[in-house]
Amino acid sequence: MEIRKLDPAVYAGRKFTARYRTNGYYAILPCESGFQMRYTAFEAPVEKSFDDEFFGEWLDHPVAYGVFEGDRLVGYVEGAIEGWNNRYRISNICIFDFENRSRGLGQALMNAILREAEASGARMVILETQTCNENAIAFYRRNGFEIIGFDLYSYSNDDPEKCEVRIEMGKKLI
């Protein structure tokens, strides 16, 4: 396994599909004091996927690292500073194939992007995930991230019914 910085001239615009499996989700429920989150198991495991591309045009000067086995890219992480609020956004972190997960590759990528974020002088690192991506939520929590917000209708008007609500997670650096 080797971590390498990815060249935007080579990777920009390349497409990939991110997949994950989940056994449940965190329902965001209104309550008297605001909202609460409650874990709910699905009746059967669910597989989710979405298509994306490297070095999205919406990012300002993104940096990306790949994890390679030989010449094969098996995962990557991408991030960029948000100058207006001095936060570093991790826009993607993904190990492409299920058989390569739980081998420390995601942790190696997280370590690389956290070093990049610290070097940028950012006050905080932030990222987005979904309430149904329970493995990602657990991974981010192990890395010191906490839930800092949510958007009930970020992806569609049916996100709560789809059990896929956007959550923002963050980790203070300074």
Predicted features and spans:
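Acetyl-CoA-dependent GNAT
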Residues: 5-99, 110-112, 116, 172-174
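C-terminal "cap" of GNAT-fold acetyltransferases
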Residues: 123, 130-137, 142-146, 150-174
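Residue-level signature of transmembrane alpha-helix interfaces in integral membrane proteins
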Residues: 88-91, 108, 144, 158-160
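Residue-level signal for alpha-helical context at structural boundaries
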Residues: 30-32, 108, 131, 158
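Short, charged low-complexity linear motifs
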Residues: 6-7, 121-127
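Conserved glycine-rich acetyl-CoA-binding loop
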Residues: 72, 96-111, 115-120, 131-138, ...
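Extreme N-terminal starter segment of soluble prokaryotic enzymes
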Residues: 1-2
